[in-house]
Amino acid sequence: MNILLSNDDGYHAEGIQILARELRKFADVTIVAPDRNRSAASGSLTLVEPLRPRHLDDGDYCVNGTPADCVHLALNGFLSGRMDLVVSGINAGVNLGDDVIYSGTVAAALEGRHLGLPSIAVSLDGRRYYETAARVVCDLIPKLHTRLLNPREIININVPDIPYDQIKGIKVCRLGHRAASAEVIKQQDPRGESIYWIGPAALPEDDEEGTDFHAVNNGYVAITPIQVDMTSYNSMSALQDWLESE
């Protein structure tokens, strides 16, 4: 199996390096990842400056671009040979609920899906037990790849930040929902000019049983199939009726 591995935390991040090490025990893995942290880059592509992939001593690549850039570049002729699967992660921090809209980790997997490959995104609820998340992914890939992976959607995996033997199981979940984000943080730079920081993610608003939030918070691995079609089909008839009534 040939796996393209990317992320949004950057090539040197601990999560991607641990995952690469474990995946290479049963697959041929090529890393094409950003040269620095590009968290929350979503699916943005770099269109106004050239991409400069750098071939590293270990045979992998880092790119001066976004996670989606990396996957787009890798699968559109930059790499020789056919890839069978795109894996993105391990992200330092969960991508639950509304997080998937902003996540570069999820976006890298979505770009793989867009280019016709089955794709997986994996995130850890912390920064400690990357080995747990890596083991979960390595356990799941043979099962998902042979039977369930659909190139029209991705599998979003979130793993509790606990030892592997404390994982209670795996749950297939829907996305939950976060409350509106908190206000930005205002500070002053040394010159007295105002600067702003986007603060941490808001607390969950919908974390009831059956959501990805609930699963991870209760010690389960959360798996959510995600598709690109964001159409609100339930609203289409009502909207059409409203337009025709005017």
From Swiss-Prot:
One of its GO terms (molecular function) is nucleotide binding. This is 5'-nucleotidase SurE. Nucleotidase that shows phosphatase activity on nucleoside 5'-monophosphates. It is found in: Cytoplasm. Signal peptide: none annotated. InterPro entries: SurE, SurE-like_Pase/nucleotidase, SurE-like_sf. GO terms for cellular component: cytoplasm. HAMAP family: SurE (MF_00060). Belongs to the SurE nucleotidase family. It catalyses: a ribonucleoside 5'-phosphate + H2O = a ribonucleoside + phosphate. It comes from the Bacteria. Its EC number is 3.1.3.5. Transmembrane segments: none annotated. The gene is surE. Keywords: Cytoplasm, Hydrolase, Metal-binding, Nucleotide-binding. Its cofactor is a divalent metal cation. A divalent metal cation binds at residues 8-9, 39, 91. Binds 1 divalent metal cation per subunit. Gene3D superfamilies: Survival protein SurE-like phosphatase/nucleotidase (3.40.1210.10).
